[in-house]
A protein has these predicted regions:
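Membrane topogenic/interface segments and analogous intrinsically disordered interaction regions
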Residues: 1-233
């Protein structure tokens, strides 16, 4: 084996034992983060609700509802799962790195490590973008379709369900988080010589079209959310 590889060649059984150890550490780290997140699930969900609460300030009659006995419980489970996964990602990524690093050349380590660091940071940036810039615009737009009961018309009021609200929020956070990973993907493709800068320029029109198609699929059917996702892509 090349001298740049730090460790000597390991037998297959040793690799399997090491893989099992890293998987156990990853699962243990996730479970700790999951149960900690479940303890704070109500606070996390209230944080996700804040952009909606901001447009209803001063109206104590506003509420979100659940219509099944188990809905709120499983919503808290989902909150804990999403939050636990995000918090545990550095632990899991570190275990992956410990497992694969001994088999990499030094130059491969130097090339790979920045992507491992940039991936969670860019995903967090995407989530922060949708929370602080998209939600404050999209939620008032959706709420504007309410209708007051007057002149014989029925009142139409927005009362979101907790499960549906969480699903929408997490879908948008996931979509924007992935869209912010595009620099990592493009850089990896360029380093692997799958794509070059000239080919990217030639296919720019198709990429723009694909960005808007992806935004239409991943976001609610309103132009504000779709444009908000397509632009970062």
């Amino acid at each position: 084996m090349d001298s740049d590889v730090e460790n000597e060649k390991m037998p297959l059984l040793d690799h399997l034992v090491e893989l099992r150890r890293r998987l156990l550490y990853s699962v243990a780290g996730f479970l700790v983060c999951f149960f900690a997140s479940y303890y704070f699930a109500a606070d996390i969900f209230n944080f996700l609700l804040q952009p909606l609460a901001d447009i209803w300030q001063g109206d104590s009659s506003r509420r979100i509802i659940f219509t099944a006995m188990h809905e709120k419980f499983f919503t808290d489970i989902k909150v804990a799962f999403f939050a636990g996964t995000f918090i545990a990602f550095p632990i899991i990524a570190n275990q992956i790195w410990i497992f694969i690093a001994p088999g990499l050349y030094k130059q491969e380590k130097r090339a790979f490590l920045p992507f491992l660091v940039a991936t969670p940071f860019l995903f967090f940036m995407g989530g922060a973008f949708v929370y602080y810039f998209v939600f404050p615009v999209a939620w008032p737009f959706f709420a504007s379709f309410e209708q007051e009961g007057a002149n014989g018309a029925m009142a139409i009021a927005l009362e979101p369900k907790v499960n549906e609200y969480l699903s929408l929020v997490m879908r948008l956070i996931f979509a924007f988080g992935l869209s912010f990973e595009l620099p990592v993907v493009m850089t990896l493709l360029a380093r692997a010589r799958i794509m070059t800068s000239s080919s990217m320029r030639k296919k720019r029109r198709y990429a723009i079209l694909l960005a808007f198609v992806a935004a239409a699929v991943l976001t609610p059917p309103d132009p504000l959310s779709q444009i908000g996702l397509a632009l970062p892509i």
